[in-house]
A protein has these predicted regions:
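Short loop/turn segments immediately following beta-strands, especially the blade-tip
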Residues: 18-25, 64-71, 110-118, 161-170, ...
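An edge-strand/N-cap motif at the start of beta-rich repeat modules
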Residues: 1-22
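Loop-centered beta-sheet repeat module
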Residues: 145-207
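Blade-loop segments of beta-propeller domains
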Residues: 29-94
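Beta-rich, blade/repeat-based domains predominating
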Residues: 36-47, 81-96, 127-143, 152, ...
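Conserved beta-strand positions in repeat-built beta-propeller and related beta-rich domains
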Residues: 7-10, 53-57, 98-103, 138, ...
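Structural signal for beta-propeller blades
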Residues: 14-15, 59-61, 105-107, 153-158, ...
């Protein structure tokens, strides 16, 4: 089964394409695709046939058909939203592209055509607040969350919505926000693969917070916050993305400042996190990804223009450094997938 990696290079106006050896984690360059306008956030359609790209320097969202034999990209559509998207995702059906706008203070839903191409005006263009940093629907595809960081006027809150998968409309849930302790700054989040739990990375708080998710009401309640930093570290740091292993046994979050990947073991019963340590990585790791099986992890340094690779210990979750690859200027997103059946 072919494993592919897409790395957006915002300051090179390119997307780099790699294949990964499933046994060794070795990456092999497959070429670069010119993408104007500062490509940054990436998202994949559920059928893995379309890649969606957010443009940061010239606001836009584009769709690219994926060649399943080569991983190559062919642009199929583009739209120009009112602001530059910070985050993209699709709903669980793949009929809609959802986007969050950090500086634009909005969340949006865009329709896609039968071939997955973007085009036309948004179905929803909702004013939220400065600092909107992510948006995803829950596994039932009936609720959505938009975390807002605690910086530059951000409200330091998670906005809760109901989502209509028939129309694509977002409606504020009750309550509409989940407030945070001062200095937390929820940024990105991931779902537990088999439990009603969510985990948010906290940008300003340099921490991860676990939440119980009520699948009937679509609301969240926190049960744990744990630091992503080692004891005694007091220098400047912000937390970026977050990802859980497909098995649900380990969770990872990068530190920008400490320049490390923090690892956590996930309790099989309660979902509570226990720190398992840190591994040094490239400077300012804004983006990272596990491979689809959770055997390897790749972290991009947006200040070094390199990508560091690690092997994941399946028993402990510990990361063993492997190779470092030059990728291009300002890597801002790492997306891994397989294109097999």
């Amino acid at each position: 089964m072919p494993y592919y990696m897409y790395v957006s290079l915002q300051d090179d106006d390119k997307i780099a394409v790699f294949t990964m050896d499933a046994r060794t984690g070795q990456l092999t360059p497959q070429g670069e695709v010119p993408v104007a306008g500062g490509p940054s956030p990436l998202a994949m359609s559920p059928d893995r046939q379309v890649l969606y790209v957010g443009h940061r320097t010239v606001p836009g969202i584009s769709s690219f058909r994926i060649d399943p034999a080569t991983g190559g990209l062919t642009q199929s559509g583009t739209i120009a939203p009112e602001a530059a998207p910070t985050f993209l995702s699709t709903d669980r059906t793949g009929r809609y592209v959802l986007s969050a706008y950090y500086q634009g203070a909005h969340a949006a839903v865009h329709p896609v055509g039968p071939d997955g191409a973007v085009g036309g005006p948004p179905i929803a263009w909702l004013e939220t607040a400065i600092g909107a940093h992510a948006i995803q629907t829950d596994p039932s595809n009936t609720f959505a969350f938009v975390p807002h960081i605690d910086n530059r006027g951000g409200p330091n809150a998670i906005f809760q919505f109901t989502f209509d998968p028939t129309t694509g409309h977002l409606t504020p849930n009750a309550p509409p926000r989940v407030g945070q302790p001062p200095g937390t700054g929820p940024r990105h989040f991931c779902f537990h693969p088999s439990k009603d739990l969510l985990y948010f990375s906290n940008e300003q708080g340099s921490s991860v917070t676990g939440y119980y998710f009520d699948p009937a009401t679509g609301t969240l309640s926190a049960f744990q916050t744990i630091s992503t930093l080692p004891p005694g570290y007091e220098a400047s740091n912000t937390c970026s993305q977050i990802q859980m292993a497909p098995s649900g046994t380990f969770l990872y979050a990068p530190n920008r400042g400490h320049n490390s990947i923090a690892g956590f073991a996930v309790d099989a019963s309660s979902g509570r996190l226990t720190a398992i340590g840190h591994v040094a990585t490239e400077a300012r790791p804004s983006a990272f990804s596990l491979d689809p099986e959770g055997h390897f992890l790749f972290a991009a340094g947006s200040e070094t223009d390199r990508l560091a690779s690690y092997r994941v210990n399946s028993d402990t979750g510990a990361l063993t450094p492997l190779e470092t690859y030059p990728v291009g200027k300002r890597p801002m997103w790492v997306l891994m997938t397989h294109l097999g059946g």
